From Swiss-Prot:
Region spans: Disordered: 169-193
Name the UniProt record assigns to this protein: dCTP deaminase
Record organism: Pectobacterium carotovorum subsp. carotovorum (strain PC1)
Chemical reaction(s) catalysed: dCTP + H2O + H(+) = dUTP + NH4(+)
Gene label: dcd
InterPro entries: dCTP_deaminase (IPR011962), dUTPase-like_sf (IPR036157), dUTPase_trimeric (IPR033704)
TM region positions: none
EC number: 3.5.4.13
List of residues binding dCTP: R110, S111, S112, L113, A114, R115, D128, V136, L137, E138, Y171, K178, Q182
Annotated NCBIfam families: dCTP_deam
Length: 193
């Protein structure tokens, strides 16, 4: 059962759930909290690699990822990031989220943006119990027109679901947690699997 607006506010009030900066009441609806777009992005460089062998040796996968992913782009205030049709880009929420060990979060895109072809997460929309950090967004433009994305715009909504008990292996205590405390648009770390 997902938390309703009253429960979300109660969890925020007593510090079990932390969202920084804390969202105002008008950004908390019946079962979700609106999140905004941050100013950090990462894109694929122009490259000549015919493919990335995801099951290949880790050092080769790592080298291939380094060749195709850009450095992080920090967009100055007031500027837009243009996502063209058929392009994938990584971005990050403005808000940082900390979940307790007995709560899982879910990220959903906004319907109004989806109707323009913008996918906010390609497949990864679960936020693990024990998560702490900003949420990376996997943008894909499946529409026909370039989309101007501006830091601070409402980009998605989080919902929260209590677990039957505290997780034995929450994300923040796992030794293999690849994105622990992430604050920027971190590229894939599949080579760390």
């Amino acid at each position: 059962m997902r938390l309703c607006d009253r429960d979300i506010e109660a969890w925020l009030d007593d510090g079990r759930l932390v969202i920084t900066p804390r969202p105002p009441t008008e950004r908390i609806s019946g079962a979700t909290v609106d999140v905004r777009l941050g100013n950090q992005f990462r894109v694929f460089r122009g490259h000549t690699a015919p493919f990335i062998d995801l099951s290949g040796p880790k050092d080769e996968v790592s080298a291939a990822l380094d060749r195709v992913m850009s450095d992080e782009i920090n967009l100055p205030e007031g500027e837009a990031f243009f996502l063209h049709p058929g392009e994938l880009a990584l971005a990050v929420t403005l808000e940082s989220v900390t979940l307790p060990d007995d709560l899982v979060g879910w990220l959903d895109g906004r319907s109004s943006l989806a109707r323009l072809g913008l996918m906010v997460h390609v497949t990864a929309h679960r936020i693990d119990p024990g998560w702490q950090g900003r949420i990376v967004l996997e943008f894909y433009n499946s529409g026909k027109l370039p989309l101007a994305l501006r830091p601070g715009m409402m980009i998605g909504a989080l919902s929260f679901e209590p677990l039957s008990g505290p997780a034995a292996r929450p994300y923040n205590r796992r030794q293999d947690a690849k994105y622990k405390d992430q604050q920027g648009a971190v590229a894939s770390r599949i080579d760390k699997d």
